[in-house]
Amino acid sequence: PGISPAHEVDGRDLGGRIATAVSHLPHEQREVFLMRMQGDLPFKEIAKIQETSINTALARMQYALAKLRDELKADYRDIAGGQP
């Protein structure tokens, strides 16, 4: 059967919203997020690249995920007409 055109458009739109939200992250958080999610790098390697501790790299990822969650939740509420 495959994916319906409406679902395909929704998927692209969601991808665009995610990309926009990622672009709003502070540089260091965005860098950690992308190295981990796109580059599949371990946190030990990310910490080495950023010349910081593993704990700092982990914290940056946690902050990035929290900010993305908040921004995307707000997007979802706007789309759903104010519903959570």
Spans of features found by a protein language model:
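DNA-recognition helix of helix-turn-helix
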Residues: 29, 44, 50-74
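ABC transporter NBD signature
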Residues: 26
